[in-house]
Amino acid sequence: MRRTSRTKPLRPLIILTLLLLCGSLQAAPKCEDFLGTLGAYPKGIQYQGCHQDIEGQTAPLIATYKVRGAEAAVAEAHLQQTYGMGRLQFFCCMWDSLRHFHRDPHSGINYQVLMASEETLANQRSQWAQIEFFYITVSVDTLEP
């Protein structure tokens, strides 16, 4: 008398379910130099560090950078060409790109990219060298909103 397993007909279904679950998993992002992780960036951009805003609604990981005003146009062009960030505009008392979202096609991680100047009266692009620093933040949400 031959015994047949009851689970044998279910085996393909179980394997398919496990494959689908594993395929949808992605490694949790960690705090790091996000621009460096995504590729090379201009030397004028200086990585300052990364921290997590645990008080924020989505507990984002935030990598910060700074770039001298004299080199800001190169940094802006790189962020526009590489990540689709908008052109910096002067509002009131600072230059701001407004937040832009970039999805890395390799990891599937969504990044928020923002570039802004310190407070300034220099309202013409030709005056950017007078601005000591522009700041770049690249953030990744760790929780759903």
Identify the residue ranges that each predicted region occupies.
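Bacterial N-terminal signal peptides that target proteins for export
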Residues: 2-14
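Residues embedded in well-ordered secondary-structure elements
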Residues: 13-16, 39
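N-terminal signal peptide c-region/cleavage motif recognized by signal peptidases
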Residues: 22-24
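An acidic-aromatic pocket/loop used at catalytic or ligand-binding sites
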Residues: 2, 26-60, 66-145
